[in-house]
Amino acid sequence: MDFSGIYEDQQFWRGKEVSRVEARDIPGTNCYCDAEAAKVIRQRMAPYLPEGIHFIDSGNYHYISKFWTDKIKTPFSLVVFDHHPDMQPSLFDNLMSCGCWVKKVLDTNPYLQKVCIVGAAEKLIKALHPNYGEN
């Protein structure tokens, strides 16, 4: 998924059988995703299955992982490699951010069984709301 042009100078994908989702023309996506942008992104993702490896631009867009997990219709566990747990409450209901997407998946996806966060500081994990401690 290309939101910023990050892949233009990259070679790892060239000559391979890959599908690219062009998203540079979608406003309202950098670090935060508004409702209109989410609608357009979901439409562009619609033809693709959740299975596989998905390159999601830079860390400014890793909230897109929620849209991929929304497509999973069987029980699953989510492993997140990040320095932050990304489980903060959203400041605005109609915006998703890099800081709240894991919480939104936990709150809305009935197939999600467990989340494992690798790399976040222990103090950030301990600061999570107690309802999320076992998940």
Spell out what each predicted region is:
Residues 1-135:
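Conserved alpha-helical scaffold segments that buttress catalytic/binding sites
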